[in-house]
């Protein structure tokens, strides 16, 4: 049941990212999604990998958030249709809750698939390729955030 609640929290964070007009609430949604994803990884046995991922992801997201909030800072940040965000989260979580019969069988079936040592060993086996892929993905996200926030008419930098 705890795994289900963490998945609902991840769903709420992702809908907050999709429906927010301001980068402040999008960053909050990304924090919720990343922390809940790392909690799911630690439930499945990868506690070290979860800790490393949350530290790396929060650092990369901090850079993207700093650039996007500097370009498109708003005086009154808002979420577009907050009731719709909460409604979608309640709808999907109740749909999943009613479709599963027993959550105990679901949580016991994934008990030994992921171990932190095997994922770290795979990272060393790839000889830094995964680090380069992560750097490239963060760079693409940064450029995407800058392109999206460039089209806004009334921003702080353009008002100067």
UniProtKB/Swiss-Prot annotation:
Reactions this protein catalyses: a ubiquinone + NADH + 5 H(+)(in) = a ubiquinol + NAD(+) + 4 H(+)(out)
Keywords of the record: Electron transport, Membrane, Mitochondrion, NAD, Respiratory chain, Translocase, Transmembrane, Transmembrane helix, Transport, Ubiquinone
Main localization of the protein described in the UniProt heading: mitochondrion
Cell compartment(s), UniProt: Mitochondrion membrane
Pfam families per UniProt: Oxidored_q3
Function: Core subunit of the mitochondrial membrane respiratory chain NADH dehydrogenase (Complex I) that is believed to belong to the minimal assembly required for catalysis. Complex I functions in the transfer of electrons from NADH to the respiratory chain. The immediate electron acceptor for the enzyme is believed to be ubiquinone.
EC number: 7.1.1.2
Entry's family note: Belongs to the complex I subunit 6 family.
Main enzyme class: translocase
Disulphide-bonded residues: none
A GO cellular component annotation in the UniProt record: mitochondrial membrane
Membrane topology of the entry: Multi-pass membrane protein
Gene Ontology MF annotations: NADH dehydrogenase (ubiquinone) activity
InterPro entries, per database record: ComplexI_Subunit6, NADH_UbQ/plastoQ_OxRdtase_su6, Nuo/plastoQ_OxRdtase_6_NuoJ
Protein name: NADH-ubiquinone oxidoreductase chain 6
Membrane-crossing residue ranges in chain numbering: 1-21, 39-59, 83-103, 128-148
